[in-house]
């Protein structure tokens, strides 16, 4: 806080002009009009106004401005988040980036802050500059540490920002990256899975009367019942083969890929609606065809190792030799034809 100096030997000294960073409580300017700081930056709302900051994004356990606080003209957004690796920050990034972008387009100066100003707020600002400048995680991190050397996002946020980059700087809920991430988050929250969110499940292909253009269905080899679509397959990079079986990897994987795995003997997929009753309340078990009860594979919320050596968590594993791939081609009359 800057204060005017008192008189000295009868001579008045004029108070120095406060910079936006000093008035905002030790916030640093990352981009013109974009500031990064901790709780001290919002301790005195009047300092924000003096600094010309009229938009504040709080990433913390509590909002910076309770109802009625702040000052007239202040725009604020509160994102509840703890500085823990298991915190889901990824799901909020689009909203945060949009808030910052909108405020700056209106000529507002924006402050992004958390409690200490080194992890949560850094992760959000990184997401913004990654998207606006099309930067890699590493490049954005280097930029932030240049202006704020103490910046250090936790390993969970680091993984989430790399997923954000892999999805093209937006949270794509249809992406295999996001589906695998969402499954891992559900596993962390629910040691006893009695109530699974419906959005976790892919639609049962038998409930859709018309196939999508160039769609690929996977059917039970024994009874031909449709089981899942190609879009439900969660790709992964191939492991190092037999040597990978020396230990089991249970840490979150940042090596997801949408490519194919030629040496893998199973598909790892997102849960499908017909699996719901099988998955509730248990951590592992068999996956059986809902029509003929033929064994298709297995599931384990703690994860399974693919034949290529890659550890997948959680795992919904369908053996390739238990299903047939059927490509559906559109024909006249909005029907579909099997290739």
Curated annotation (Swiss-Prot):
Q: Where in the cell is it found?
A: Nucleus; Cytoplasm, Cytosol
Q: Where does substrate bind?
A: 115-120
Identify the Pfam families for this entry.
Answer: DSPc
**Which reaction is recorded as catalysed by this protein?**
O-phospho-L-tyrosyl-[protein] + H2O = L-tyrosyl-[protein] + phosphate; O-phospho-L-seryl-[protein] + H2O = L-seryl-[protein] + phosphate; O-phospho-L-threonyl-[protein] + H2O = L-threonyl-[protein] + phosphate
Protein encoded by which gene: Dusp12
Predominant location: nucleus
Gene3D superfamilies reported for this sequence: Protein tyrosine phosphatase superfamily
Region span, Disordered: 1-25
A single cellular component GO annotation = nucleoplasm
Protein name as it appears in the record = Dual specificity protein phosphatase 12
């Amino acid at each position: 806080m800057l204060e005017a100096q008192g008189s000295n030997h009868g001579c008045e000294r004029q108070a120095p002009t406060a910079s936006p960073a000093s008035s905002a409580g030790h916030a640093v300017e990352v981009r013109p009009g974009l500031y990064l700081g901790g709780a001290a930056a919002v301790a005195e709302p009047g300092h924000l106004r003096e600094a010309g900051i009229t938009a504040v994004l709080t990433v913390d356990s509590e909002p910076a401005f309770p109802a009625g606080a702040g000052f007239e003209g202040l725009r604020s957004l509160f994102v509840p988040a703890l500085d823990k690796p298991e915190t889901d920050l990824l799901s909020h990034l689009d909203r945060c980036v949009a808030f910052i972008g909108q405020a700056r387009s209106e000529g507002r100066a924006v402050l992004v802050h958390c409690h200490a100003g080194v992890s949560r707020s850094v992760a959000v600002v990184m997401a913004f500059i990654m998207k606006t400048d099309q930067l890699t995680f590493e490049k954005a991190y280097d930029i932030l540490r240049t202006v704020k050397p103490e910046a250090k996002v936790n390993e969970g946020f680091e993984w989430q920002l790399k997923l954000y980059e892999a999805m093209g700087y937006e949270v794509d809920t249809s992406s295999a990256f996001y589906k695998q991430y969402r499954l891992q988050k559900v596993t962390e929250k629910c040691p006893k899975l009695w109530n699974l969110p419906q959005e976790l499940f892919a639609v049962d292909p038998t409930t859709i009367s018309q196939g999508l253009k160039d769609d690929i269905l996977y059917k039970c080899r024994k009874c031909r019942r449709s089981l899942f679509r190609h879009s439900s397959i969660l790709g992964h990079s191939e492991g190092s083969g037999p040597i990978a079986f020396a230990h089991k990897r249970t840490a979150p994987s940042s090596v997801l890929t949408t490519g194919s795995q030629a040496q893998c003997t199973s598909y790892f997929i997102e849960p499908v609606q017909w699996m719901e009753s099988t998955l509730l309340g248990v951590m592992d078990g068999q996956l059986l065809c809902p029509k003929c009860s033929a064994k298709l594979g297995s599931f384990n919320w703690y994860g399974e190792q693919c034949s290529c050596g890659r550890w997948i968590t959680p795992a919904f594993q369908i053996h390739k030799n238990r299903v047939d791939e059927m490509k559906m081609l559109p024909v006249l009359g909005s029907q579909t034809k099997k290739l």
